[in-house]
Amino acid sequence: VKIAFQTAAKRNHHVTLVDKANVLATSKLWRRIANQVAKEFPEISFDSCYVDAAAMKIISAPEKFDVIVTENLFGDILSDEASQITGSLGTIPSISRGDHGPALYEPIHGSAPDIAGKGIANPLSMINSVAMMLDHSFNRKDLAKRITDSVNKTIEGGTTTPDLGGNSKTTVVTNAIIKRIEEN
């Protein structure tokens, strides 16, 4: 929970706790802890939302959110839902981290065995995960920005995999991004 507030301090200064405290005892604990942590960060606005309402708001008003903190089950569901705003599960990075020790950066999607070997997997979530790692674990915002800018320019240029409406293969998209990174 504390990491959510620390992250919000570097962004738009807002944290939303997503839980189901009206039903689940574990969510009541989450809410109690989050309210305590919120007091340590008076400069960060904080609210809480039940997961069913959050699912609706993510689609109807995604701009209302900055940093969402939630338990794994709800996070898995909401991140898959939110990926549809970008057009594909294949674009979204994720981070799992605690107060100490290493963090895990990975795409939110699974291994996609149904498209294995076809050369059509979207590489953006993996590339965006690397950018997130450079930013959060190595404090290399400059490199992270080069990567994300290159990803965005590649998409804007129309080089995308089929899940985003394009016809490019995984390697073509990856190589286009690498070329843009090298040019920047």
PLM features: residue spans?
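Alpha-helix boundary/interfacial micro-motifs
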Residues: 36, 83, 88-89, 139, ...
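Glycine-rich phosphate/nucleotide-binding loop
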Residues: 58-158
